[in-house]
Swiss-Prot record:
GO terms for biological process: chemotaxis. Its main location: cytoplasm. Residues 170-358 form the CheB-type methylesterase domain. This is Protein-glutamate methylesterase/protein-glutamine glutaminase 2. Residues 7-124 form the Response regulatory domain. The active site is at 182, 208, 304. Contains a C-terminal catalytic domain, and an N-terminal region which modulates catalytic activity. SMART domains: REC. Keywords: Chemotaxis, Cytoplasm, Hydrolase, Phosphoprotein.
């Protein structure tokens, strides 16, 4: 017997977006668009009669903006919400507000060539809706998420950094922490970083997120945290009390120069369909930090970071996976656990302790 279809409500003031998305989604066997509304006021009329499994929501609309509508939804009946946002600075900042309010995913759309983009990105949108439908709703208001990037042939970290044959390095006492996360990661990272004291090991982070979003995200976390948080720049030194977030659209790797660790921010192909990729970061940490590092994999769909965490463990790093109960999507941690890559499985509220104490 076939399973129940995912019921979707579309809310977007663009008639083109509504028309194209309805056509795309209704052609997908496991998805059904229950209604399409031009703004949140119309959407609320639809919700009075039927409630969807997932809401796809624009953020900038007349009469009522998407953020106000989202907060209303999350306070009355928490529901997985996928944000459709333009790749502008204003759009990025507004979308981050949406993530804080409880949205699950960001899908970015251009300001021109919209129809062709939506058709070409159909697989991305479908993946985001499926992830949202399978998300842990009870965690939505507490810790939320990020974008699914454009699908491509699935390259591994070998495309950026070939696997090393050994891990012998000069001695150093500096300790670093590498964190990888995706769907659910924006507020999961907020929960972890805001729990840290000013004095803590240097941290490098890959959060799956488009370009233009990461700078705003880092700035927001910096304002909430005792430690310094910023978007990484090429050749930045990893310092105690500093968290560096990989820029969207770039890979980030850790390197060593004498006793000091630095980051390289580079271009390159999508790895595990992502750029930045957690596997790329974790492999570089395994090679250049080894036993001086801790690797942490948190909420997110897919398997990016699972193999890299195993490489870190094999290189002598301590490793942690977030537990299922506190994840929005138990994908990346689950795959790492399957590979026996995680020494410890911890709830979100305890993960900061793994940063402070190896």
């Amino acid at each position: 017997m076939p399973g129940k279809k995912i019921s979707v409500l579309l809310v977007d003031d663009s008639a083109v977006v509504r028309q194209v998305l309805v056509a795309i989604l209704n052609e997908t066997p496991d998805i059904h668009v229950m209604a399409a509304a031009s703004d949140p006021i119309f959407a609320m009329g639809k919700l009075a009669h039927e409630w969807p499994d997932v809401i796809v929501l624009d953020v900038e609309m007349p009469r009522m903006d998407g953020i106000t509508f989202l907060k209303k939804i999350m306070s009355e009946r928490p529901t997985p919400v996928v944000i459709c946002s333009s790749l502008t600075q204003k759009g990025a900042e507004t979308s981050l507000q949406a993530l804080s309010a409880g949205a699950v995913e960001i899908i970015t759309k251009p300001t021109t060539g919209l129809k062709n983009f939506l058709i070409e990105s159909a697989a991305e949108l479908v993946a985001a809706i499926r992830a949202a439908a399978n998300s842990n709703v009870k965690n939505l208001g507490k810790r939320t998420a990020t974008p699914v990037l454009t699908p491509a042939s699935k390259l591994t970290a070998d495309a950026i950094l070939p696997a090393a044959s050994g891990h012998s390095m000069a001695q150093t006492t500096e300790r670093i922490v590498a964190i990888g996360t995706s769907t659910g990661g924006t507020q999961a990272l907020e929960a972890v970083l805001t729990a840290l004291p000013r004095v803590c090991p240097g941290i490098v982070i890959v959060q799956h997120m488009p370009e233009k979003f990461t700078a705003s995200f880092a700035e927001r976390l910096n304002g909430l945290s005792q430690i310094e948080v910023r978007e990484a720049r090429n050749n930045d030194r990893i310092l105690p009390g500093l968290a560096l977030i990989a820029p969207g659209g770039k890979h980030m790797m850790v390197t060593r120069s004498g006793a000091y660790y630095h980051v390289q921010v580079i271009d390159g192909p999508l790895v595990n369909r992502h750029r930045p990729s957690v596997d790329v970061l974790f492999r570089s940490v395994a090679r250049f930090a080894g036993k001086n590092a801790t690797g942490i994999i948190m909420t997110g769909m897919g398997d990016d970071g699972a193999r890299g965490l195993k490489e870190m463990l094999d290189a002598g790093s301590s490793t942690v996976a977030q537990d299922e109960a506190s994840c929005v999507v138990f994908g990346m941690p689950k795959e790492a656990i399957k590979l026996n890559a995680a020494q410890r499985i911890m709830p979100l509220q305890e993960i900061h302790q793994a940063i402070l104490h190896r």
